[in-house]
C-alpha cells in the first residue's frame, strides 16, 4: 500500500479523496494554482505544492508540473479525480515512465474508451447495444448535414474527445446541424484540444442511465448497480439518483453484464462508468465509457456501502477486489443535487464572487435518512472564473425514493449561500415537482417543464401557509428583540397575549392571530386552524429552522426594509407583517412598475468574447445569434430578443468583459 499520494485536482473532489486517504492512513499532497492558494483542499492535505498561474492550462493541466510535485514530496501515486487530466492517456504513461503509480485505469483502456468513435466500435465488437450513427470523423458542416439527413432527425453532434456536456448539440434541422457543428467543434477544441466531432441518432424522450464498474489488475470486473442522471441541462447533469426508478432487476442485470463485458474487452482495471441512453420501454444503447471516477459517485456509495475511492487506491496498489458480484447488494435510495454558482433566473449563467455566507446543512443521520455534503469551499472563499462553477454535491439517502427526495428537499431549504448567485432555488423547485417525484423522467425534463427558463414560483397552498406562519413567528421574535433593546420592562403576563396580524405574502393577505407561549407561539388562521410554531431561530441567521404544526421545516430568510424575503421548497416571496390597520393602509399604497429598455445587449456574466456574429447596420430577427461569450469552459450564444437594427458594437473578439458590460446597441 502507498504511504503518500498526490491529488492532481482541486475543489470538492480533491477534498473527497483526501478524506478517504486520511482514513486509510495515507498521507496526501495537494497541488494548487495562484487562484487556489487559500483553497480548502490545500489546507486539508498534509503537504501542498504550488504549480502555477490560475488558468488550468498553465497549472493543473501541465503533466510535468504534477510529476515534479511528486518528486519534490515523494508521492508514490497520483489520483486524478475527475476532469482535468483524469482521461488523458498521456498522463498515466508519463507517470509510469517516472516510476509513479496512476490511481486509475491503464493507458490502453483510456485510449480505447476515450475516443468516442473508437469506443462505439469496441462496444459493438463486445456485443453491447449501440445507437445508430456515423462513426467517422466529420470535416465540414455540409458533410454533417448530409449525414444527419441520412440518419434522420433529430441527431446529436458530439465531440469525439468530449465529456461533461461540452462539445454536444442536439439538432432538429439542417440549419441547426450547421450551427451545432461549428459550436461543438469550437468547444471541443478549446476544452479538449481535439476538434473531431461525429453524428449519431438522438433517441427521442430518452433517459440517461449509467452503470458503475470496478476492476482490478487480476482480471476481475464487477458492476455496482446503476445511476439515473436524466435531469440534465445543456447535457450537464443536475440531479442524479441510485437506483433508477425505471429499471427492473432483469434490465439492471442485462445492462450490468454488458458493461462488464465491455470493461473486460479493454482490460479495465479501476473504477469506471458505462453510460447508456434508455427508452421508456427499457431498451438501452451504449453512449460512452468514462474512464474515471464520476462526479455523481456518492449515490452509488450510499446504496452499496462501498468507498469507491478506497477501492481505486487498493486496486492501483495491486490488491484484488475484496468482493464478488454476488456480494453487491443495493440498499435504499440516494439522491444527489449539484449545487452550482450560477443564476437560474438568467438562463443559468455562471456567477463569481466571494461566499459571504456558506452554511450547508448538518451532515449525518436525519431521522431514518442520512445527509452528506461533498464540497471544496468555505465561507469567505472565492468562486473564480477559471474553473468549474460547482460549489457542492448535496446527497441524501433514505430507505425509499420518496423519503430520500423529502430529505433532499429539507437539506436544500437549510443550505444557506450568499455573496453569489446559485441554483439552490431551482434544485428545491425540482424536488417539489410532481413529475420528478413520480419518476416520470427524460433528459428533456428541464426543457419541457421550464421552457421559458426558471423563475422561483410564488408560494401556494401548504407551502404558502408554512411561509406565512414562519413570517408571523419571525415578526414576533423581532418585536421581542426590540422590546428588549428599548429597555422597557416586560411583564411576565406579556408571554400570554393575543395579537391580530395580517401577513402580506407575495401580494396575498393571510389574517392570523398570534398567541405567545413560553416555548412556542400559536398561529391561528382565519378559518380557525391553529398551528403551533416552535423555533430557536435568532435574528440575523440565514435559515429559520423549526416545526410548524408538528412538521420540521427549514426556510431561507433575508432581511428587507420592513419585512423579510423567504425561500422554501423552491418558492420565493417577500413577507411583511402588519397590524390590521397597517394592512388596510398598505393596500392603498401605489406600486411603481419598472420599465426596461431592451436597446442594449449586455454581457450576462464575466467572460471572454469568442466572436461577434453581426456588424453595425445589420438588421437582425428575433432569435438570431449576435455574439458568443465563453465563461467557465462553456460557450454561451447571445441572441436577439426582438427584431432590430444594430446601431453600434462596443466589444470585439478576445475582449474580457465584466458582467453587464455593453456588447452592442440597437437603434
Model-flagged regions — what are they?
Residues 1-274, 278-297:
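N-terminal beta-alpha lobe that positions the nucleotide/phosphoryl donor
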Residues 87-94, 336, 346, 549-580:
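Structured, non-catalytic alpha/beta "coupling" segments that mediate domain-domain communication
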Residues 168-170, 201, 247, 390-399, ...:
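Short, well-ordered beta-strand elements within core beta-sheets of diverse protein domains
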Residues 259, 298-529, 659-665:
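Catalytic cores of soluble metabolic enzymes centered on carboxylation/carboxyl-transfer
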Residues 307, 516-522, 526-543, 547-554, ...:
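Conserved nucleotide-binding/hydrolysis modules and their immediate coupling elements
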Residues 323-331, 447-450, 454, 489-491, ...:
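Long, charged amphipathic helices and adjacent flexible linkers at domain junctions
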Residues 592-667:
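Structured functional modules or segments
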